[in-house]
Amino acid sequence: MTRTLIVWGAGRIGRGFVADLFDSPAFHTVFVDIDRALVEELNARGRYTIVHATRDGLSRRVVQNGFCAVHTDDAQALNALFEEDQLLLDVAVHEPKLPEVSDMLLPLLRHRMTVCPNAVMDVMMNVNMPHPDECFLSLTRERFTDAESAWFTAHVGVTGIFAMCISPIAPEWLLKEDSLVLFNNGYPEQAIDKNRLKGEAPALPRLRLTEDVAREETRKLYTLNMAHALISYLGLPMGLKTSREAAINETLRPILTGALEEASFGLSRELGFSEDEMTEWRQTILRLLENPYIEDSLQRLGADSRRKLGAYDRLVGPARLCAKHGKPPVQLAKAIAGGYSYENDDPGTHAVRDFVRAHGFEAALAEFSDLHPGDGIYEYVCM
């Protein structure tokens, strides 16, 4: 039986990573997106290129057939999809869009409950944030009645994911060849929590089933995503432009490695990763950042500083674990401080900078990062 995979969000991760993992005769992939022009182009062409850029070089593959695209306004097509047995849904959107996507999914889930109340489905949350599965569950429960919540709990599995796919905008020379091209680091797998699934677990070579995906999600957020934020907030004032340029910079490198060591210290004591595991993990992160083909923009990596400076997000989160277990988060604190000076033309960053100008740096630390004197972090950020 061919199963349907809905990828909600046909962007760089949805098309370039998730659909690549599920490119199998066992699955029919349906992209759902709000961009009508993209939906029409995908359907008209029926193919697109993915370029994997690893340290060893570039490789290409063409994804064709086996997929179609649907616009978010096409209620009839979406209702039909949500009647499929053993349905899989991968939500691949940016964190700020999650409430909006939850609102779009609500009538579709209600339709499924009405038309096929005994059918099960599973949702994979491919959203770059702490605990996206719990956030999605909270958003749905806020919108459901008690009876609907009971049905949802019994028939819909929701799992976070773990992956380290880095997917910047494709270079101009590739876009000239194929306007739909995706460009990423060729990360080989995605992990999901098998204990959260209601339906049959997908059997695919690059989909790994784990028993605690939240632990792996947290490690990734507090190391790889932390590193991206750090090199952005500290690299831009130095005149650096790209992730690789920052990762190998002789001034910034010791701060980066020191912050990774601080994060590792907290993670190993809080979540049980061994020192050997974390040493190997840090080397993996550095190799990803040193990839000569993935020149991600530091300006892009720092965007939405309000979110990235959040109390349990990629910078303050590992600093809290580090301080909790007795180690001063000196290098992480430098990145947190740098984030409050970051400038970008997005609403989250504007909110941070406007607040700093109106109320001062210390008040902003309390407002956005929940940092206060005596918490083991505040003093180092204010040094």
Regions found by a protein language model. Name each.
Residues 2-6, 12-383:
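Substrate/ligand-engaging "lid" and interaction regions
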